[in-house]
A protein has these predicted regions:
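Glycine-rich phosphate/adenosyl-contacting loop at the front of the ribokinase-like
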Residues: 1-61, 70-73, 253-254
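Structural alpha-helical scaffold elements that stabilize or flank donor/cofactor-binding regions
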Residues: 130-131, 188-189, 219
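Conserved beta-alpha-beta core of the PfkB/ribokinase-like small-molecule kinase fold
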Residues: 137-214, 233-235
Length: 304
C-alpha cells in the first residue's frame, strides 16, 4: 500500500447500488436457483475512488449523480471509505442499480444487469472548473460515454482539465456498451485523455486485434499510456506504439470478480500520484485486484 501522495485525485463516475447474487453452476430457466444475495454500494467510479483512498491517497474526491432514494446511504458509505463525495441528487431519476450474477465456480465470473438510473444523467451543468482546485489527476469512468448528457459532460471536463494541465485517465468500463457506442466514436471521444485503462476484452474490441499485446500497442498510438488489465494474466503497459512491460498478476482465490478492474485502477492511480513510475503503479494495481477478487462486492474492506 502506498502513502504520501501529493494533490487530490478527482474521480467522476457512476455511483450505484449493487445487488450481488452468488450462485453455483448454470441458472435454471423457468424455476428457482439457490443463491446468496447481498445489497452493497457500488459503481465503477465510486469503487475506483474507494480503492484509491484505501491504497493511501489522502485526498480522493468523487463527483457522481444519484437519486434521492439512496443518496444519504451512498454518501455515508463513501465518507466511511475515506472519500470526499460530491453527489448531485437527481430530482427525477432513482439511483442506478446493478444486479451482479456471480457464478461461485472456480472463475467467480460475473454478469451484470444494469439500470443506470441517475448515474448517466450527469451533464455539463454539473461541472465547475473549481472542481479541479487542488487536483493533480482527473479520472473518468467510461460509463459516462454511454449517454448523451454524460458524453457532453466528459467533453467539458476534459477541456477544463487540459486547460489547467491536469492529466486525465479513463477506464472504458464495458465491452458490451462499447459495441453499442462504436469503436470509432469511442476513440474520438477519448481524444485528449492521457491514460487509458481497458480490460483485455475492451482493448481487443477497440483495435480489432486478437492478441492483447498487439491491441495495447495499437491503442498507445491514440493515447499516450495504455494499461491493459488482464485479470489472472496481469497487466500490459504500452506507449508510443510499443508494449514496454508485462506485470504479472498476484495469486488469488477468486470469490467474486466484481470490481477487480476498479481496484486495479484505484491502486494504480494512488501509486502514480506518489511519483512512482507506471510499472510500479501497475504492480500495486495487480495487488489490489487480487485482494478484490477474494471479497464479495467491488469495494475494499472498511476502515478500522
Amino acid at each position: 500500500m502506498t502513502t504520501g501522495p501529493t494533490g487530490a485525485l478527482l474521480v467522476v463516475g457512476d455511483v450505484v447500488t449493487d445487488i450481488v447474487a452468488r450462485h453455483r453452476g448454470p441458472l435454471a430457466p423457468g424455476t428457482d436457483t439457490a443463491a446468496v444475495i447481498r445489497t452493497v454500494p457500488g459503481g465503477a467510479g465510486a469503487n475506483v475512488a474507494c480503492w484509491a483512498a484505501h491504497w493511501g491517497c489522502a485526498d480522493v474526491r468523487l463527483l457522481g449523480r444519484v437519486g434521492a432514494d439512496a443518496a444519504a446511504w451512498h454518501e455515508r458509505e463513501l465518507v466511511a471509505s475515506g472519500v470526499r463525495p460530491r453527489l448531485v441528487v437527481d430530482p427525477e431519476a432513482a439511483t442506478g442499480t446493478v444486479i451482479c450474477l456471480v457464478d461461485t465456480g472456480a472463475s467467480a465470473e460475473r454478469t451484470f444487469l444494469t439500470d443506470s438510473g441517475a448515474a448517466l444523467r450527469l451533464g455539463p451543468e454539473d461541472w465547475s472548473d473549481s472542481l479541479l482546485d487542488g487536483v493533480v489527476q482527473l479520472h473518468l469512468s467510461g460509463y459516462l460515454l454511454f449517454s448523451g448528457p454524460s458524453r457532453a459532460f466528459v467533453a467539458t471536463a476534459v477541456e477544463s482539465a487540459r486547460a489547467r494541465g491536469v492529466p486525465v485517465s479513463l477506464d472504458p468500463a464495458s465491452a458490451g456498451f462499447l459495441v453499442e457506442l462504436g469503436v470509432d466514436r469511442f476513440l474520438a471521444l477519448v481524444e485528449g485523455v492521457d491514460v487509458l485503462l481497458p480490460s483485455r476484452d475492451e482493448a481487443c474490441l477497440l483495435t480489432g486485434l486478437p492478441d492483447p499485446a498487439d491491441a495495447a500497442a495499437k491503442l498507445s498510438r491514440h493515447v499516450p499510456l495504455v494499461v491493459t488489465k488482464q485479470g489472472a494474466e496481469g497487466a500490459l503497459l504500452a506507449h508510443s506504439g510499443t508494449v514496454h512491460a508485462h506485470v504479472p498478476a498476484e495469486p488469488a482465490t477468486p470469490r467474486d470478480t466484481t470490481g477487480a478492474g476498479d481496484a486495479f485502477t484505484g491502486a494504480f492511480l494512488a501509486t502514480l500520484l506518489t511519483g512512482a513510475d507506471p510499472e510500479k503503479a501497475a504492480r500495486e494495481g495487480c495487488r489490489a485486484g487480487a485482494q478484490a477478487v477474494e471479497r464479495v462486492g467491488g469495494r475494499p474492506p472498511g476502515r478500522e
